[in-house]
A protein has these predicted regions:
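Glycine-rich phosphate/diphosphate-binding loop of Rossmann-like nucleotide-binding domains
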Residues: 6-23, 27-29, 147-216, 228
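N-terminal beta-loop-helix "entrance" segment that forms/cooperates
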Residues: 33-57, 222
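Glycine-rich phosphate/nucleotide-binding loop
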Residues: 45-48, 114, 222-323
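N-terminal glycine-rich phosphate/adenylate-binding segment common to multiple enzyme folds
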Residues: 49-154, 237
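Short acidic loop-to-helix transition motifs that present clustered carboxylates
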Residues: 111, 213-220
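Buried hydrophobic packing segments
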Residues: 21, 25, 198, 290-301, ...
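Buried hydrophobic positions in well-ordered alpha/beta secondary-structure cores of metabolic enzymes
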Residues: 11-14, 67, 131, 168, ...
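Flexible, glycine/charged-enriched surface loops at secondary-structure junctions
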Residues: 33-39, 175-183, 205-213, 303-310, ...
Length: 345
């Protein structure tokens, strides 16, 4: 059956890295017989330009009907002070598709270890996943600003906590089988609920070890001993901070993909970096995060594990061969990086 993939190129370097990733997907499909079609839609600043809204109705309709969604990058300086901004499109898309689970893998490529701000021995063996709850918590609670006083409500239901923790256990089952649940149980009521739910869900996964960690000590361990982690699961606010902290371990945002999953609808795959408008159109953008996001899509949405591994291996050996874009310390163009990966599929 033909798989429908919606491509949201977005803004800045988005169109360049999207096309690079689709070239890799096309080359892979020729070798493996993967049957798919691409539906390109405007989104972000491109959506505002085309339809006056960062998430046009037709784009949302296409996303609802898709088997998976690829997003490259959004954001443009021309909208920084505007009422309608590209970033509002992503928030709306997450809400409309109920993308509750953000998955961010953190892996250090051997050939890029020198880019990390940490000593090489400290990042040896780092390979973990951050699972962040994306649609609940303090970001979605009431925000009250009064004269000389303010409060933000952190609100979670049992069901919201259960589904994200269950997702983490399912991921851990196919890895090293360790879940580290991160909370602030010694202070926060929501964290007390979080820990209670984690203990309950763990009973359904006797083959997976559950560990608890307070968020402050987890932030420290991510720097002092990051290799200890396998699958981290945490609430929205903590996950926002810790996933950004984890992204600096590699020393570059240019090789880090991510996914956002719903319960029953399509998943969204995107790089963690921004739209880099300062280098847009120059042909020097690093496409690896977008290409690895395609690999995540093949594995998570379509169960094509070998195809995903072929892409990931091609990326790894290309980097090991010294083919590096400028952000990685090399001179390869977007086109040269893409061609190198395709040649090694």
């Amino acid at each position: 059956m033909t798989k429908k993939i919606v491509a949201l190129a977005g803004d800045g370097i988005g169109p360049e890295i999207m096309e690079a990733s689709l070239e890799v997907l096309e080359a892979l499909a020729e070798k493996t017989g993967f049957d798919y079609e691409i539906d390109r839609r405007p989104f972000g600043g491109a959506g505002i330009d085309a339809a006056g809204h960062p998430l046009p109705d037709e784009t949302l309709k296409a996303c609802r009907e898709a088997d998976a969604i690829l997003l490259a990058a959004i954001g443009s300086p021309q909208y920084d002070s505007a009422t309608v901004r590209p970033e509002q499109g992503l928030l709306a898309l997450r809400k409309e598709l109920n993308l509750y689970a953000n998955i961010r893998p953190v892996k250090i490529f051997e050939s890029l270890k020198h880019l990390s701000p940490l000593k090489s021995e400290r990042i040896a063996g780092v390979d973990f996943v951050v699972v962040r709850e994306l649609t609940g918590g303090i970001y979605f609670g009431d925000h009250i600003l009064e004269e000389r006083k303010a409060r933000d409500i952190n609100d979670y239901s049992y069901e919201e906590v259960e589904r994200i923790i269950r997702k983490a256990f399912e991921i851990a089952r196919n890895r090293r089988k360790i879940v580290t649940s991160i909370d602030k149980q010694n202070v926060l009521a929501t964290s007390k609920l979080w820990r209670e739910v984690a203990e309950t869900v763990a009973q359904d996964f006797p083959d997976v070890t559950l560990e608890h960690q307070l968020v402050d000590s987890a932030a420290m361990l991510m720097i002092t001993n990051p290799a200890k982690f396998d699958v981290i699961v945490t609430e929205n606010l903590f996950g926002d901070i810790l996933s950004d902290e984890s992204s600096v371990l590699s020393g570059t945002l240019g090789v880090m993909p991510s996914a956002s999953h719903s319960e029953n609808g399509p998943s969204l795959y995107e790089p963690i970096h921004g739209s880099a408008p300062d280098i847009a159109g120059q042909g020097i953008a690093n496409p690896i995060s977008m290409i690895l996001s395609v690999a995540m899509m093949l594995r998570d949405s379509f169960g094509r594990f070998e195809d995903a591994e072929r892409i990931e291996h091609a990326v790894e050996v290309s980097l090991a061969a010294g083919i590096l874009t400028r952000d990685l310390g090399g001179r390869a163009s977007t086109k040269e990086m893409t061609e190198a990966i395709i040649a090694r599929l």
